[in-house]
């Protein structure tokens, strides 16, 4: 969750795309409906049709402050299991993450403080449930998600910074001078402001230890002006008493006396509950790192010991935002051992002085930085890897953003994770490409990503599976093959409290309280499982200019691809990563093989029968709907068919438009009409005059009846499809009592099994789920029965609309009384909308048709 640099680079990273060479050509084909004999499929199809455990995605599970419950934990894990997830990594955060460490007053469960016994009991319950459900459960290495520390870290074990005071004196006499102790800004030297409950301000809080904790390093005297030869730097440390009194016979000339020391940076872990907030440990001190890890492991073993390796499996370290320290107690000896010379005379470069020459001072700074990188590797990361291995815990990490060499760290980590965001609805990688490149080089096959981290502009209970699909597809094409979703929030309350808890303003709302979770999430996860199964199979083929090329024939797609290979099998994932239809000529660096087209949305597979070969390449057209993707698989030698079929994609023929009336049932618990409503014509709910429909959020059930008379001949091998037209946002279809599945992305159609249609009274039922946004906006038309405070994003993200957070849990909520505002239905901890916010199109808009292909 790299907030700081990510925010600085938004305009750059939104323009980072996979490079695909473009070649010219013209072609257009039609669908061939001949089926592949699935018994002929070898290993790739086995994992595609039945994805293994390794292909299942995971989530970052956010426990927000005191808002936790056993019942909610069980429901969360069961929902994840049923949807097809495998791993969950828990973070224990503040009630609200922006402002950092903000709390919501009047909590129903105020005693649940991170890393205290009531909290650990809930962690144990989660581990027991994970074991029961055969899920992989672990957690971050302390409170917060940044970076490694807690209340147990004292000032001397915290991250350190060098500081100094200076005095100008004239020589040729005895100097008796009280040297001032170096002073630093008492406010924390950290990346982001905190909400400080002691002052009520959003600030970098004053740290008492930055006023009181100090250790001397050295006292140096040198000529007051100009470049200073190293032999003119005089160490006066032995001439200063412990209380800072200097007694020195100064040579002739003007001298500057520097008193160098170090103090705590005051860097605090973020964003944790205020009661659980403490210092970041010194990452360059073996004493501090071991102390932190011993505390983490000892507490984990105390409460979860018998579950380690079964219900509890890993400790996570997130992307680094703790700042760069400039000192550690053993820095001088570490520097000399690693760089071969004494750093002491050169410390004045921190005060802006030049020692020997500009080149020498530059070299010293580079050597000093290199020593910091060495210590992060040898002290911090190697100690983590060693300690966790000894404790039988896996080491998970996002190894970027900090003062180290990334390629040296990744081999120490069991599961390396990279990161991508959603920015203005597009794929926005952060440190993804270099991480993937380094992982490929090291031979690691599984490339995980913190996936879909989002700003409130995009992520405000308005996300859909169809919206996230092309963003995830772009990440797949960049090399990611295991999604770890950001984020899934622990929902502690009963199922009437919806949409419930949030991570403040951050992240895509992959929560079990989503309107579309029941029908949409299993379908989306199955898609990811199929993709990840094939994207983990074999090895990535290094990218080169003509490995895959495409030329747009119709439309304006953004085509991305990735190529994997194992022995004689080539697998290409080809994705249209924008919401445009297109026909694209595709050129693959394969010859003599039969191309096959596998659809990860529905699991269907078929041969490509119309293609040509030229110069060792296979060439054919692909027809893409909005954000559609395919796997193109070459695994069998090409054998020329006896009766060749010249077309790959066929035009569809409309055989019936369903114009009958629809009976639509809404859930009155969320403001919908109590009785079913007749729709003579399908329409957007937001255009309806009935406010219960206009502002409705949730699932509504459409039902209609229609007659159908087929003109198909007995030898006609074409198939019939139900086409839904425009759907906002998820549709689960039943025809004559048979479940035809869930539609969540284009093309919005499903094949009708042979023999299912009748001539008379076909019964069609469609469950349609929209988004929470409209009900939340509808609630804003009513009197508010909660108090809100403005969300703070700070100066580091200008232009983003944050929203407001709940000031306190209202008494009616805590006491489980009827809410005062009868026209309100939703309850959540973050407000994204006002009464003027635009509604989002909803419902089955159609037209609904039967087509033949």
Please give the residue ranges for each predicted region.
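Mature N-terminal segment immediately following signal peptide/propeptide cleavage
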Residues: 40-87
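Carbohydrate-binding surfaces of carbohydrate-active enzymes
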Residues: 57, 73-74, 87-88, 108-145, ...
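An acidic-aromatic loop/edge-strand motif
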Residues: 145-148, 152, 168-170, 183-216, ...
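Extended acidic/polar, glycine-enriched regions
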Residues: 210-211, 215-303, 612-654, 759-761
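Aromatic-lined ligand-binding clefts that engage carbohydrates, nucleic acids, or primary amines
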Residues: 587, 706-708, 712-736, 743, ...
